[in-house]
Every structure is written in structure tokens, then in C-alpha cells.
């Protein structure tokens, strides 16, 4: 295989060379796709840059990121985090990415503005039992809890699923949101073949979660 550049008007000439069997255009340069998240999720339509557009940026709303420890310091989160329970947990950076997608302000680069740039972000260390969610919801008005962690294949509708469903049922303003699709090559014993075991963790089987 030979890669080369040549003028478009020479394509016919090139194709007539006897030892050339096949000609194809090269792929376009790769582009990061995560920056299109706001438009894919339509959050750009409720928090627009237009003077007369909607400005719902989640100001006054509290959310929680259950992840791998302290987030930042970063100007995209300045003045909007509560991290007292992870103050000395400085090891991971997965939570920084998740928090940025959720509520980055786009101060450093507007292209990376998150879904809810005005939200107050409570940061906690992830635990599969999601402890104290109800307490945070009741005491600090935290509405959305985001957990982008998996803990192996599902074991069906477990006692943990029941616990989370019950908490949500009794506290209607509490919303649990989980990652999915990150284990798309797994079967997880479903019997449908590779690609079906893409939701990891017992709590993700609950009926009232997103």
C-alpha cells in the first residue's frame, strides 16, 4: 500500500498505470467526538448563547458525582464544589472527567462546557451501596447522583436494587444516574452473544434509575 498526494486532475492518469489495482481516498483526520455532547444531549437548546435564548444552566441545583476522589483544582469548577469527604483523596482523575461532562463551566475552553455549568457539585468517593444518598437529598437538596462506575456483571434484581428503588420511591426528587455501554464486548451470561452485557453493576438493574 502506498499513500501519496497528487492533483485531482491526475486521477485518471494514475488509474491507467498497469500495476495499480486499486485506488482509494484516505480517511479524514480523526476528531474528538466528546465535544459534541451538549448538542447530542440537547442541553445547548436550553442554555443557549443567544441573547434572547433560554438560559437554564442549572444554577441553584445541587448534583453529586460519586467517583474516585477530589476533583480539580480547576477554574471550570471554581466556587461550585463541596468536597469535604474527599479532601485528602487525590489519586484519581476519572472523577474530573465525569464532573467536567456534568458541570464544567467552560472557563478554560468554552468548547468543553458541561451539561449543567451552574450546578453545585458534591463530590464523594464511589461505593456500590451509594450510602447517604437520601441524607444528601434531604439535607442539601442534592437531586441528581451520577455514578460512572461498574462492578462486574449483573446478578439480577438484588437487594441493592430494591434498596435504591425504595429510596427513589420515597424521595421523588432523588435521581440516580449510571453509566452504561462500557462493556459492550461482554455477554454477562445473557445468552444473546457479545454486545448485550453492557450494563455493569447490580444497582443498574433497579427499575427507577437512569
Regions found by a protein language model. Name each.
Residues 146-148, 176-181:
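Active-site neighborhood of phospho(di)ester-bond hydrolases with catalytic His/Asp-centered motifs
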Residues 127-135, 194-198:
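Alpha-helical scaffolding within the catalytic cores
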Residues 182-205:
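Glycine-rich, charge-decorated loop segments at or immediately adjacent to ligand/cofactor-binding or catalytic sites
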Residues 1-51:
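Autoinhibitory propeptides
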Residues 8-11, 17, 95, 99-102, ...:
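Extracytoplasmic/secreted envelope proteins and their assembly/folding machinery
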Amino acid at each position: 500500500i502506498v499513500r501519496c498526494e497528487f492533483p485531482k486532475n491526475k486521477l485518471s492518469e494514475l488509474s491507467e498505470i498497469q500495476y495499480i489495482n486499486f485506488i482509494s481516498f484516505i480517511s479524514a483526520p480523526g476528531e474528538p467526538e466528546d465535544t459534541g455532547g451538549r448538542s447530542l444531549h440537547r442541553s445547548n437548546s436550553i442554555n443557549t448563547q443567544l441573547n434572547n435564548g433560554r438560559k437554564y444552566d442549572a444554577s441553584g441545583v445541587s448534583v453529586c458525582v460519586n467517583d474516585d476522589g477530589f476533583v480539580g483544582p480547576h477554574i471550570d469548577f471554581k466556587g461550585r464544589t463541596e468536597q469535604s469527604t474527599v479532601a485528602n483523596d487525590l489519586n484519581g482523575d476519572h472523577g474530573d472527567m465525569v464532573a467536567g461532562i456534568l458541570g464544567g463551566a467552560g472557563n478554560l475552553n468554552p468548547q468543553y462546557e458541561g451539561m449543567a455549568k451552574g450546578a453545585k457539585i458534591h463530590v464523594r468517593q464511589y461505593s456500590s451501596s451509594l450510602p447517604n444518598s437520601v441524607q444528601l437529598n434531604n439535607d442539601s437538596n442534592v437531586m441528581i447522583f451520577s455514578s460512572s462506575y461498574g462492578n462486574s456483571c449483573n446478578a439480577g434484581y438484588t437487594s441493592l436494587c430494591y434498596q435504591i428503588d425504595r429510596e427513589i420511591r420515597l424521595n421523588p426528587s432523588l435521581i440516580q444516574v449510571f453509566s452504561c455501554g462500557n462493556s459492550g464486548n461482554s455477554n454477562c451470561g445473557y445468552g444473546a452473544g457479545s454486545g448485550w452485557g453492557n450494563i455493569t453493576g447490580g444497582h443498574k438493574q433497579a427499575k427507577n434509575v437512569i
